[in-house]
C-alpha cells in the first residue's frame, strides 16, 4: 500500500510525519508541489503546499494542481493534513482535491487525544474546551467563531457535508451510517472521534470499503493511519 500526505504547512508535514517515522517508516517530505514527487520503494511521501495563509482561490488551485501530478488509483492511502481548529483554507483545499478527482470522497476525523482535541456530535473541542473558547480563539489570523464542523466548512463550499456521530461510531452502525450519508449525496463526511481507538476503528472499518478517500485531520489522524499501515505490513 502506497501512502501520500498533503499538508498546508511545513511544520505540519514534519509533526504528522513523525508518527510514521516513529514506527520505522521512511518518509520523504517535499517542501512544495513543484518538487520531484518520485519515491523509493516503501518510502512514504508528504507534500507541503504552504496553503494555510494563501488567498482562498490559490489554496484550491494548489491542491487541484497537485492531484493532477499524482497517480490516480485505489492502492494509495491519501491523508490531507489540516490545522487543529480549522484555522485556514480547509474548505477550499478540499474543494480542489475533489474537483481534481470527482470519484473520491473526504473523510474528516479531527482529534488529537494527547492534546485534549476531539470531535463530538460534529463539534470541535480543543484542550477539552469547545473551539470558540479554546486557546485557538486567540489566533490573530483565523480565530474560530463556531464549533460545528459541517457549518465551519459549509460557509466556504457548496459540497454536501455529512456527519457520522459518536453513536454510530461506538454503537455498531458506523458502516451503515456512512453508506447512508454517501447515498444522500455527501462527498465530505465528518466523523466523531474522541479516543485513539475511535480513530483506528473508523479507518479499519472503512478504508477497505472506500479506498478512494482523502483521510483528513490533524495529529490524531496521522497516528491512526500510521498504526493502520503498520498493521497491513504484519498481515
Language-model features: locations:
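Cap/lid and interdomain-hinge subdomains that line or gate substrate/regulatory clefts
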Residues: 1-2, 26-30, 43, 59, ...
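N-terminal basic/disordered segments at the start of proteins
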Residues: 2-40, 111-114
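Short, hydrophobic/glycine-enriched beta-strand segments
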Residues: 3-7, 106-108, 214-216
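Short, structured active-site "lid" loops
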Residues: 44-57
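A C-terminal functional module that forms or caps the active site or interfaces directly
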Residues: 196, 216-224
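Soluble secreted/lumenal catalytic domains
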Residues: 205-212
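N-terminal extension/subdomain marker
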Residues: 227-228
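Conserved small/polar residues in nucleotide/adenosyl-binding loops
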Residues: 233-235
Amino acid at each position: 500500500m502506497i501512502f501520500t500526505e498533503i499538508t498546508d504547512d511545513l511544520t505540519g508535514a514534519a509533526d504528522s510525519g513523525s508518527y510514521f517515522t516513529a514506527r520505522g517508516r521512511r518518509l520523504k517530505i517535499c517542501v512544495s508541489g513543484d518538487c520531484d514527487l518520485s519515491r523509493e520503494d516503501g518510502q512514504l511521501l508528504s507534500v507541503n503546499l504552504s496553503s494555510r495563509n494563501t488567498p482562498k482561490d490559490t489554496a484550491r488551485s494548489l491542491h487541484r494542481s497537485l492531484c493532477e501530478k499524482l497517480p490516480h488509483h485505489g492502492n494509495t492511502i491519501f491523508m490531507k493534513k489540516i490545522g487543529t481548529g480549522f484555522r485556514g483554507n480547509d474548505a477550499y483545499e478540499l474543494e480542489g482535491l475533489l474537483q481534481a478527482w470527482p470519484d473520491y470522497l473526504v473523510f474528516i476525523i479531527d482529534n488529537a487525544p494527547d492534546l485534549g482535541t476531539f470531535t463530538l456530535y460534529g463539534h470541535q473541542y480543543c484542550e477539552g474546551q469547545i473551539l470558540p473558547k479554546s486557546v485557538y480563539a486567540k489566533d490573530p489570523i483565523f480565530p474560530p467563531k463556531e464549533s460545528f464542523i459541517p457549518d465551519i466548512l459549509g460557509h466556504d463550499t457548496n459540497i454536501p457535508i455529512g456527519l457520522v456521530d459518536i453513536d454510530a461510531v461506538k454503537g455498531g452502525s458506523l458502516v451503515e451510517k456512512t453508506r447512508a450519508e454517501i447515498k444522500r449525496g455527501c462527498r465530505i463526511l465528518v466523523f466523531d472521534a474522541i479516543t485513539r481507538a475511535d480513530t483506528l476503528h473508523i479507518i479499519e472499518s472503512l478504508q477497505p470499503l472506500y479506498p478512494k478517500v482523502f483521510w483528513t485531520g490533524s495529529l490524531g489522524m496521522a497516528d491512526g493511519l500510521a498504526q493502520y499501515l503498520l498493521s497491513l505490513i504484519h498481515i
